[in-house]
């Protein structure tokens, strides 16, 4: 995506937002909030306690402002994020050294535009002979949100819109490797929210990101929801802090892709290359291994070889690179350890690590391997894709189920056989199952909504505003039955 294309898309989205979501009369006539609209005071507080206290005060004031102000706040946050998608993308790559800024632009943009807002909080009414019961969605209060270094700005944008749309405030705990990018994203969103009428302190964090401070935030008595987007270690901390509260925890995945003989060739290979190389494969939903049926093998491999974005390694090069990038992994390994120096790096950097030079247009390294190869069983988070062959579609689906590790996170299939597609979807039971497209299309690039936090271990799936609100039931007996 060129700079001109990015500028055009951002301009079009901002115009559409202005047209579709004009300021309502109710908001326009409302007196200004007491907090100065020129600044949010900065999102960084000196300590965890100070950040939580600030968030508690802000949330109480925010809830009193009502839904119309909340809608305008979300609209303003979207516009601020959209206007800065490219700058935040470049900041993230510069700070973390991971991913491709052009791809991060797309992630930031889809999070700003496709994350559900207040419209996700749908009230319900039940009427009958005994009267009426009304169900409305109320905020929890303060949400503690842990964010990863792999998708820093996108996660801040997505989580902040979801959490604030539900009427909460949020204290973020960014990964230390992406702290600067996350704070800048928070500052932009916070200032936009305040300018739209929100109190300051609605989006905040604290100095000195550390393991101890993260634990203190998760265990803080005044946070009502713990939201964790990160690796297994921090998820374990969130689940064992000893505090009773709602916890939404994202977890690992090792998304398999099955290609059968009825797939569309070469489109299936093109989709796999796009998805597996997008942002250098650091998305937890990205294609991590391809399992192709024996009857489809030759056509799939031919399609891979004809695409200049993919560079095929030989067996010797593969083993050399595996030793370099995977410290601990393989079948049966529950806690793989990767060489962080290569996580999220360009394919050219991986190739250079083994003394190999590849063409500039190559975005993905790939290789055909046996079923038991470590690459098939390890979530590698880099543009290094294994392709393995199964006897038939049933064997391919069984292998995909095993390689995914029971995480029930993400899987995909390329097939035009409805029976095969149904069989795999039912077998995998994943939060995201994508048919005949890159897995990104299950995360907001296709139909549906966007999220950067997929709470598979806690049963939440793709999170949105309603996950951060609790239903309140109000019953009136004997009245309001009018039919």
Predicted regions and their residues:
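Rossmann-like NAD(P) dinucleotide-binding subdomain of oxidoreductase/dehydrogenase enzymes
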Residues: 123-267
């Amino acid at each position: 995506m060129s700079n001109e294309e990015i500028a055009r898309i951002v301009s079009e989205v901002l115009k559409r937002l202005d047209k579709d979501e004009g300021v309502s009369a109710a908001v326009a006539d409302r007196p200004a909030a007491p907090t100065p609209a020129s600044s949010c005071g900065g999102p960084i507080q000196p300590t965890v306690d100070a950040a939580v206290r600030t968030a508690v005060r802000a949330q109480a004031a925010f809830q009193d402002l009502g839904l119309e102000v909340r809608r305008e706040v979300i609209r303003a946050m979207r516009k601020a994020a959209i206007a800065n998608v490219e700058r935040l993308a470049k900041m993230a790559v510069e700070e973390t050294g991971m991913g491709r800024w052009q791809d991060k632009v797309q992630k930031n943009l889809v999070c700003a535009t496709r994350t559900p807002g207040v419209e996700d909080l749908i009230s319900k009414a039940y009427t009958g002979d005994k009267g009426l019961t009304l169900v409305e969605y109320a905020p929890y209060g303060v949400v503690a949100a842990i964010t990863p270094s792999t998708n820093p700005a996108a996660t801040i944008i997505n989580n902040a819109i979801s959490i604030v749309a539900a009427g909460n405030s949020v204290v973020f705990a960014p990964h230390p490797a992406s702290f600067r990018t996350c704070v800048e994203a928070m500052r932009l969103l916070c200032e936009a929210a305040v300018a739209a009428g929100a109190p300051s302190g609605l989006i905040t964090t604290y100095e000195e990101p550390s393991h101890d401070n993260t634990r203190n935030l998760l265990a803080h008595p005044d946070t009502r929801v713990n939201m964790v987007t990160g690796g297994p270690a921090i998820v374990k901390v969130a689940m064992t802090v000893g505090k009773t509260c709602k916890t939404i925890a994202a977890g690992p995945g090792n998304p398999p892709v099955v290609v059968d003989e009825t797939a569309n060739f070469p489109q299936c290979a093109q989709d796999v290359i796009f998805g597996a190389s997008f942002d250098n494969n650091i998305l937890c939903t990205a294609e991590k291994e391809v399992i192709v049926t024996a009857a489809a093998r030759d056509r799939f491999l031919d399609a891979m070889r004809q695409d200049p974005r993919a560079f095929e390694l030989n067996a010797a090069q593969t083993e050399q690179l595996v030793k370099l990038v995977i410290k601990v992994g393989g079948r049966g390994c529950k806690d793989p350890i990767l060489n962080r120096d290569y996580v999220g790096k360009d394919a050219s950097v991986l190739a250079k690590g083994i003394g190999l030079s590849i063409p500039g247009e190559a975005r993905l390294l790939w290789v055909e391997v046996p079923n038991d190869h470590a690459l098939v069983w390890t979530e590698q988070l880099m543009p290094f894709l294994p392709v393995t062959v199964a006897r038939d579609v049933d064997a391919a689906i069984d292998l995909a189920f095993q390689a995914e590790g029971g995480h029930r996170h993400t899987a995909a299939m390329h097939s035009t056989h409805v029976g095969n597609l149904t069989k795999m979807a039912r077998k995998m039971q994943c939060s995201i199952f994508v048919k005949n497209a890159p897995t990104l299309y299950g995360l907001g690039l296709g139909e549906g909504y966007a999220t950067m936090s997929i709470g598979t271990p806690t049963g939440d799936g793709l999170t949105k505003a309603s996950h951060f609100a609790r239903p309140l039931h109000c019953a009136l007996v004997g009245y309001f039955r009018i039919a």
